[in-house]
Amino acid sequence: MRTLDKRIAPNVKLAASLVARAPTLTLAYDARCKSRLAATLDTGEDVAVLLPRGTILRDGDVLVADDGALVRIAAAPETVLRVRAADPLTLMRAAYHLGNRHTPVEIGDGYLKLEADPVLADMLRRLGTQVEETLAPFQPEAGAYGGGHKHGHDATFAEDYALAQQVFGEHHGHAHSHSHSHDHDHDHDHDHQHGPGCAHGHGHDHH
């Protein structure tokens, strides 16, 4: 069994004819988020995918097998929610609430697209959007926080929301209490002051 263990950087331009001759590995979004999996090429050949942890494959990516051959990644059609609204403000509000939940979202011209989730579908309808379940490839925006993706009903939602609020507070100078002592060393050489604009990188407990 061949192993696909390298991804060619997106900024590396390959000859179109070379990519066109490469066999295709068609994967849904969940599978493209896995750095290690057994998969089957569209030719029927079984392969192993072994990539650095945290790798998320996108439609059009090119992988290199351990024998030097190329394999092209394609996004498989899957069940998704296509979200539209009568006005841009309503769609922006929907995007804001999805972002608060760290939900992977594909942003298109006049629509949002996300994985099918009944909890999120209900929330989006309550916000005044039109939600349509359809079958289509899913290509969400790259995440700002990293890590796995979350659904509206995940038990970790409260933790994610707290993290988002913490990051927001640190980068916008919001005052907050500190429950830990500040006797640790800092690797910068300027005075360390805890004023309203404090935005240092260690975690804070919020009360």
Swiss-Prot record:
SMART domains, sorted: UreE_N (SM00988)
Domain of life assignment: Bacteria
Keyword line: Chaperone, Cytoplasm, Nickel, Nickel insertion
One of the GO biological process terms: protein-containing complex assembly
Gene3D superfamilies tied to this protein: Urease metallochaperone UreE, N-terminal domain, UreE, C-terminal domain
GO cellular component, one term: cytoplasm
Basic and acidic residues: bias regions: 180-194
Subcellular location, record wording: Cytoplasm
Disordered: annotated span: 171-207
Pfam families for the chain: UreE_C, UreE_N
InterPro entries for the chain: UreE, UreE_C_dom, UreE_N, UreE_N_sf
GO MF: nickel cation binding; unfolded protein binding
Family according to the record: Belongs to the UreE family.
Described purpose of this protein according to its UniProt entry: Involved in urease metallocenter assembly. Binds nickel. Probably functions as a nickel donor during metallocenter assembly.
HAMAP family: UreE
Protein name per its UniProtKB record: Urease accessory protein UreE
Annotated organism of origin: Burkholderia lata (strain ATCC 17760 / DSM 23089 / LMG 22485 / NCIMB 9086 / R18194 / 383)
Gene label: ureE
